[in-house]
């Protein structure tokens, strides 16, 4: 094959890798996604036409943001571009934060000043939990140090004027379009498409409008002790003067009152045909009145209640309770997404939601291991009988007879190829059931087209998405707002850490100089083998070995992560440590994990990317990362989550968990590392850069001589490009396993002839045929 053809193909591959390096979950095939119907307001941005810009591009907001006289007592700055800055040291910080989490998206939350951003979707979420347009604008004005810019007020009104005013409610197994605004109902009924969706009686006449008054109260009772909410008492200085302006204090009391009081609401509704629900939803979005889905589970007499309750030992933490109150705030179940850090108890939130609804529940995870863990969580926290839990994976297909809780994976339900007879029977059963609640674990990782497939296969009245990292490099994360529902709650990682609900982690980036021989080859080689060179850097190996020895002497439990299987095996075998990767059998995995948990002699294990989200190891308190998936922010946060669980019986000190990311200096790995840290830095974490590990010279470490390093280099150079690739986990979304690629390879992989190289190439054209080719074309062929 010609040099130019190879160069072009390599250029295309590198361009493709540029996008793949960001996030492995965004691998939807182009053209397969149909555009979701969304309200036009969702694409709106804050109008900044009145903002002056100087010659350097800086924006002058002085005329739009005049300071109030008592600005020192108020915690917010509201900028005309929609960004809101909150002073975390303000005496009224707790209240202001609760309000901002409800109406805006967190951008960055370091120690002293937090940044949020108003978006159309965040305002949709605010309306969905009961906030009115006037509430949002009034509260912002009272909390702000300056006047709120008029552009912000108009943007809030535009996004909230119609959203949340119409609900699709399931009562007694019948669907109703309901609103507390009669004029909105009349406006909708003037549309011919909606009139067609309206249910008619036997004479062909439309059913009557139903007017009723109901009392709404949260289905989650607020705990009296330790609710975790901020105190409503005034903050006073030593002289007894209040630091809080009167209007702010009145506003806080009103917020508490609104949350606690029973509320009587008069609604108008009409019944619609069940078979036309999807068409009705699309038409309402087109009319700028998107339907909010609510499930009146207490009045659902068609679907039987299941025998499930929380055990007395299950005690909700304040943030878990608050997230569930957002979901069940008006006595009905709202569909939406709850965002909690890894290790903060997302599973208990899901189990509590199932115990509250008490209808048949379907749980979907992203792997067979997560299915087993969800089953264990239901048995740990609830009174459900083991016979009522049914698993549906490639390995475990429990009989669904008498089942109330079904647990499966996205890939099992979204599978489109031929199934076994047994799997077909279970799928038929799943399709025919009417599920009260669907819990979607790790909801951010699944492409939108997979959701649409899953959501059309099974019918559920309420959908709850759970995740720790609601981030994607593409724009598909916004699809969750209309495929599942708005974000109901997002916790603050630093607050949970300071309260002791998650571990206090010291994050460190360890810079490992490349040895001269390795760096010479790294600069010369342009293939994927560069990844192997900076992963197998002898100085990185020595740093890893030193950290393992240091923490084992402290009796710490250590996990070492490597995405590259070649490096994983080399490190683990050389250090004589057990390792787990894709082909490791389930029995061997469980044996290694049990030894790691309970055997004091096994304090270190090596794990490939299979452990990113599937493994629950609360004993681990040290994590060392030697290779990773490019610049994936999600993976960095998920791996940190392996050591985030609160530590029991640890020595009281500043940090009780450690996260080390080993990076080879002056390589592409450093740029990836900076990208990976963005999400955690935005959550308030700081990464300490270590250029030299104290005491490393005194240890007896591997690869201390030039001869050993040269032998390692020869081993790396003898490896194939296939060895340099990351592990592809079976059943993982976005995996490239179904794609076919052409590579160079050594014959040793097929016949053992190590010195023979097998290459594919096209025979070049005969030299005689180039005599009559114009020189211009010769030039392009070079």
Curated annotation (Swiss-Prot):
Phosphorylation on Ser-751 by CK2 controls the 5'-excision activity of ERCC1-XPF endonuclease; phosphorylated protein inhibits the excision activity and thus NER. Dephosphorylation reactivates the 5'-excision step. Phosphorylation has no effect on transcription or the 3'-5' helicase activity. SUPFAM superfamilies: P-loop containing nucleoside triphosphate hydrolases. One of its GO terms (molecular function) is promoter-specific chromatin binding. Coiled coil: none annotated. The keyword Lipid biosynthesis does not apply. Its EC number is 5.6.2.4. It is found in: Nucleus. Phosphorylation on Ser-751 by CK2 controls the 5'-excision activity of ERCC1-XPF endonuclease; phosphorylated protein inhibits the excision activity and thus NER. ATPase activity is stimulated by TFIIH subunit p52 (GTF2H4). DNA translocase activity by this subunit in TFIIH is stimulated by XPA, ERCC5/XPG and XFP plus ERCC1. It catalyses: Couples ATP hydrolysis with the unwinding of duplex DNA by translocating in the 3'-5' direction; ATP + H2O = ADP + phosphate + H(+). The keyword DNA repair applies. Residues 21-30 have a biased composition (Acidic residues). One of its GO terms (biological process) is UV protection. A motif (DEVH box) lies at residues 441-444. Residues 1-51 are annotated as: Disordered. A motif (Nuclear localization signal) lies at residues 6-18. ATP binds at residues 340-347. It comes from the Eukaryota. Residues 542-702 form the Helicase C-terminal domain. Pfam families: ERCC3_RAD25_C, Helicase_C_3, ResIII. CDD domains: DEXHc_XPB, SF2_C_XPB. The modification Phosphoserine is found at residues 686, 751. Belongs to the helicase family. RAD25/XPB subfamily. PANTHER family: GENERAL TRANSCRIPTION AND DNA REPAIR FACTOR IIH HELICASE SUBUNIT XPB (PTHR11274:SF0), RAD25/XP-B DNA REPAIR HELICASE (PTHR11274). Component of the 7-subunit TFIIH core complex composed of XPB/ERCC3, XPD/ERCC2, GTF2H1, GTF2H2, GTF2H3, GTF2H4 and GTF2H5, which is active in NER. The core complex associates with the 3-subunit CDK-activating kinase (CAK) module composed of CCNH/cyclin H, CDK7 and MNAT1 to form the 10-subunit holoenzyme (holo-TFIIH) active in transcription. Interacts with PUF60. Interacts with ATF7IP. Interacts with KAT2A; leading to KAT2A recruitment to promoters and acetylation of histones. This is General transcription and DNA repair factor IIH helicase/translocase subunit XPB. It comes from Bos taurus (Bovine).
């Amino acid at each position: 094959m010609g040099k130019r053809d190879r160069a072009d193909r390599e250029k295309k591959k590198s361009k493709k890798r540029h996008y793949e390096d960001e996030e492995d979950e965004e691998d939807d095939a182009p053209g397969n996604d149909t555009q979701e119907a969304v309200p036009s307001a969702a694409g709106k941005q804050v109008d900044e036409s009145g903002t002056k810009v100087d010659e350097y591009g800086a924006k002058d907001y002085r005329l739009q943001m005049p300071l109030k006289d008592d600005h020192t007592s108020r915690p917010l700055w509201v900028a005309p571009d929609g960004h809101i800055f909150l002073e975390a040291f303000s005496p009224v910080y707790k209240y202001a934060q609760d309000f901002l989490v409800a109406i805006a998206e967190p951008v960055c939350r370091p120690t002293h000043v937090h940044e949020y951003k108003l978006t159309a979707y965040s305002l949709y979420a605010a309306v969905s939990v009961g906030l009115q347009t006037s509430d949002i604008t009034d509260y912002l004005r009272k909390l702000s140090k300056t006047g709120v810019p008029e552009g912000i007020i108009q943007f809030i009104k535009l996004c909230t004027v119609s959203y949340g005013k119409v609900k699709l409610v399931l009562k007694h197994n019948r669907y109703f379009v309901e609103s507390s605004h009669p004029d909105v109902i009349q406006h909708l009924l003037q549309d011919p498409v909606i009139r067609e969706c309206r249910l008619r009686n036997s004479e062909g006449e439309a059913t009557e409008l139903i007017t009723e008054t109901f009392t709404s109260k949260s289905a989650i009772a607020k705990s009296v002790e330790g609710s975790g909410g901020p105190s409503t008492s005034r903050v006073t200085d030593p002289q007894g003067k209040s630091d809080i302006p009167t209007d702010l204090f009145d506003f806080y009391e009103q917020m508490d009152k609104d949350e606690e009081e029973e509320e009587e609401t008069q609604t108008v509704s009409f019944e619609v045909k069940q078979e036309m629900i999807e068409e009705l939803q699309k038409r309402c979005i087109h009319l700028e009145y998107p339907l909010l889905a609510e499930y009146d589970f207490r009045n659902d007499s068609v679907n039987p209640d299941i025998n499930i309750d929380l055990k007395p030992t299950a005690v909700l933490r304040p943030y878990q309770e608050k997230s569930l109150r957002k979901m069940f705030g008006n006595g009905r179940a709202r569909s939406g997404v709850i965002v909690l850090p890894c290790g903060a108890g997302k599973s208990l939130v899901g189990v509590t939601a199932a115990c509250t609804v008490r209808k048949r529940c379907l749980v979907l995870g992203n792997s067979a291991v997560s299915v087993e863990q969800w089953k264990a969580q239901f048995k740990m926290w609830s009174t459900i009988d083991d016979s009522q839990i049914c698993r549906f994976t490639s390995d475990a297909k429990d009989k669904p007879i008498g089942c109330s809780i079904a647990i499966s994976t996205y890939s099992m339900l979204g599978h489109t190829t031929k199934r076994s007879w047994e799997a077909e029977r279970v799928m038929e059963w799943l399709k025919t059931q009417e599920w009260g609640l669907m819990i979607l674990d790790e909801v951010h990782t699944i492409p939108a087209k997979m959701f649409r497939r899953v959501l059309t296969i099974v019918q559920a009245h309420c959908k709850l998405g759970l995740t720790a990292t609601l981030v994607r490099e593409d724009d598909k994360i916004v699809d969750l707002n209309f495929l599942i529902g708005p974000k109901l709650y997002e916790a603050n990682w630093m607050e949970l850490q300071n309260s002791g609900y998650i571990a206090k982690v010291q994050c460190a980036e360890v810079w490992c100089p490349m040895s001269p021989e390795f760096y010479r080859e790294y600069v010369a080689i342009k293939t994927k083998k560069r990844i192997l060179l900076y992963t197998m850097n002898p100085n990185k190996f020595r740093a890893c070995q030193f950290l393992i020895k240091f923490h084992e002497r402290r009796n710490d439990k250590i996990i070492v992560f490597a995405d590259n299987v070649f490096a994983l095996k080399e490190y683990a075998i050389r250090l004589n440590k057990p390792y787990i990767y894709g082909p490791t059998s389930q029995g061997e995995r469980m044996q290694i994990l049990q030894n790691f948990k309970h055997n004091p002699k096994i304090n270190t294990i090596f794990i490939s990317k299979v452990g990113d989200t599937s493994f629950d190891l609360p004993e681990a308190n040290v994590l060392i990362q030697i290779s990773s998936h490019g610049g994936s922010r999600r993976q960095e946060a998920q791996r940190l989550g392996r050591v985030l669980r609160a530590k029991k019986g640890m020595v009281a000190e500043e940090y009780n968990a450690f996260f080390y990311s080993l990076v080879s200096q002056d390589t592409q790995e450093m740029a990836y590392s900076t990208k990976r840290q963005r999400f955690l830095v935005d959550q308030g974490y700081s990464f300490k850069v270590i250029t030299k590990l104290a005491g490393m010279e005194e240890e007896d470490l591997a690869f201390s001589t030039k001869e050993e390093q040269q032998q390692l280099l020869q081993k790396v150079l003898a490896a194939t490009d296939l060895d340099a690739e990351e592990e592809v986990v079976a059943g993982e979304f976005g995996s490239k396993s179904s794609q076919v690629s052409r590579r160079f390879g050594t014959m040793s992989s097929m016949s053992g002839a190590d010195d023979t190289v097998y290459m594919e190439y096209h025979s070049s054209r005969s030299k005689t045929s180039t005599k009559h080719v114009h020189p211009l074309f010769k030039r392009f062929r070079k």
